[in-house]
Amino acid sequence: MRQTITEKIFSEHVGEAVFAGQIIESAIDMVIGNDITTPISIKQFELSGAKKLANPDGFAIVMDHYIPTKDILSANQAKISREFAYKHDLKNYFDEKDMGIEHALMPEKGLVVPGDVIIGADSHTCTHGALGAFATGMGSTDLAFAMITGRNWFKVPPTIKVIFHGKPAPHIYGKDLILEVIRLIGVDGARYKALEFCGDALEHLDMDSRFSLCNMAIEAGGKSGIVAVDEITKEFLADKNLRAEPKFHYSDEGANYEQILQIDVSKLDPVIAYPFLPSNGKSVREAVRDDIAVDQVFIGSCTNGRLSDLRIAAQILKGRKVARKTRLIITPATQKIALAAQKEGLWDIFVEAGAVVSNPTCGACLGGYMGILGVGERCVSTTNRNFVGRMGDRTSEVYLANSAVAAASAVAGKIADPRDL
């Protein structure tokens, strides 16, 4: 019987052919925790009486949400993870010395390998599907179970196939494609489904755009997002010291899909998700007509804090100034990205434009720190969620957009189309 890429990955891990709807127990290749979710997992690990990790090299702790710590509570949270990492001599432990947002850092370090089954105690773990892996978020207790046993149970998800056709116009990126998908199917349109992204338009999407695409699968309710390995993937992996030998899986012709969605990306304008749902997508042209003034612009996160995002922003900001009544915060996703941006002179452009450039952190995205919104404030953000109170006060508003729209809006002081600058 013909299989989807997701069914093939699970079949390889289980040792027999499995299909959508089956309950299975699978080996886990990589388990990922962070400074917020891992302490709960550690508590359960210790309560179980376990003395060692089932697969130490397949476990990573990435300190990213409140790093450097913002207060005593976050410092104590971080301390739990640090002490556990030191006690177990954890190889894949990343803190201030080699920091980054987990969903950008893990692929950068070669710790995400095509064909993997990956779980993380963070809902945007689905990002890693861009490398042809099955990756999904779970709770901290599930993470603890995998830490102890190296395994976990799954219901093999059915798949929605999303076929992107055409060549994207200038300033159309993976962020716009996934916002369009979510606009079409809604925030629960892919509930417990694998979103398989394919089509000739992917030839025009670099890995950074593909990570953005898979990152927001969860915003449609998806169990995972996945892109099969191609030459663009292989080029990205070429300089990585991969944790294991990659395994390339591809969906069979005639595999069973629950739904097939086709989108002509050549007709897309940049998409902006209005408050308070990622599905509330509108064309940037409509947003410009609405004349929406913004107090803050944030460029960063596991969705759009990669080097290409910073380059896009720099192209727009060069020789320009951030509007007087608007503040711009730029947060590179990893130290490596930050260093590359410095070497390319991007930081000079940002600072001269009037932006604040921070260390890598989730920070503002979750309303944690370093960019919290006040009463009634509006923000154009390259992040992935715009729920009520997501980035600050409950009366604040977040508009999700790509990095070009964000940078243009910072200059204009209101939502702007980068093609107009």
Language-model features: where?
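Fe-S-dependent hydro-lyases/dehydratases of central metabolism
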Residues: M1-L421
